[in-house]
A protein has these predicted regions:
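Conserved mixed alpha/beta core segments that line enzyme active sites in large multi-domain catalysts
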Residues: 1-59, 102, 111-210
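Conserved small/polar residues in nucleotide/adenosyl-binding loops
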Residues: 219-225
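A short, polar/charged loop-to-alpha-helix boundary motif
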Residues: 63-76
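Short, charged beta-turn/beta-strand-edge "cap" motif at the junction between a beta-strand
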Residues: 60-61, 214-217
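Contiguous hydrophobic segments
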Residues: 119, 216-219
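Active-site-adjacent segment of 2-oxoglutarate/Fe(II) JmjC oxygenases
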Residues: 74-120
Length: 229
């Protein structure tokens, strides 16, 4: 709803040096499917999304079909208070956020929620380990995928993620420095001393960067799927 340079004027508390956070998520994109309103301003409760969900109608219908049989120990008899999971008037981004929020609040990690909703194209990948294919097969059995151009960033509990749709139809770059991990649609969003950069690259189709705030070190997996930090 405003430009990046106006953010500190709208939220003056972020200019206070005592205001400290492990992460920040900022979204600045024009609205393609809905008219811009404050209620649809991103990031939402869990994620920010750049793209379009082409399977939105089917995803909403499937979620509505799942609702009568939803049970979870965390909510017990209060499960009906969560319904409808997706507001029928919600944008595609807001609907995806509601679905991911349901998953993380029912004890799934944010990386798991991402691969359940926006999985990789795995069926014919010979370079995938069997355990990884089995994981995606399980996810495919319990959750319909949300397909379409999608680059997402989000945070919940001890995790922050950035991930892509299975076709890689949106740009998503990352830069790893001595102190920070920065992901976004373009490289160069934040001025960084080149001497501080350890690694930079792109997040590929279906891939994900996942940061665990409780970890004391980072690990770059060699699998063609996930970069864990």
């Amino acid at each position: 709803m405003f430009l990046a340079e106006q953010l500190s004027n709208f939220y003056p508390d972020i200019q206070d040096k005592r205001f400290i956070s492990n992460f920040a998520v900022y979204h600045q994109r024009y609205s393609t499917n809905t008219f811009p309103t404050w209620s649809l301003a991103q990031p939402f409760r869990v994620i920010a999304h750049n793209g379009e969900i082409n399977t939105l109608k089917g995803n909403k219908n499937w979620m509505e079909a799942h609702e009568p049989r939803m049970i979870h120990a965390s909510y017990d008899k209060d499960i009906d208070d969560l319904k409808p999971i997706i507001d029928r008037t919600a944008s595609d981004s807001a609907a995806l956020d509601s679905t991911i929020e349901l998953l993380v609040r029912t004890k799934r990690s944010l990386p798991m929620a991402k691969l359940m909703t926006i999985p990789e194209a795995f069926a014919h990948r010979r370079d995938f380990p069997k355990k990884l294919k089995d994981l995606y097969t399980y996810a495919n059995a319990v959750m319909e995928s949300w397909d379409g151009p999608a680059a997402i960033c989000g945070c919940h509990d001890q995790w922050a993620i950035a991930g892509m749709d299975r076709n890689g139809l949106r740009p998503l770059r990352y830069t790893l420095t001595n102190d920070f991990l920065i992901t976004g649609s373009e490289t160069g969003m934040v001025e960084i001393d080149e001497a501080e950069i350890l690694e930079r690259g792109r997040v590929g189709p279906g891939q994900m960067i996942a940061v665990n705030f409780k970890a004391v070190s980072y690990t770059h997996l060699t699998l063609p799927t996930i970069l864990l930090v």
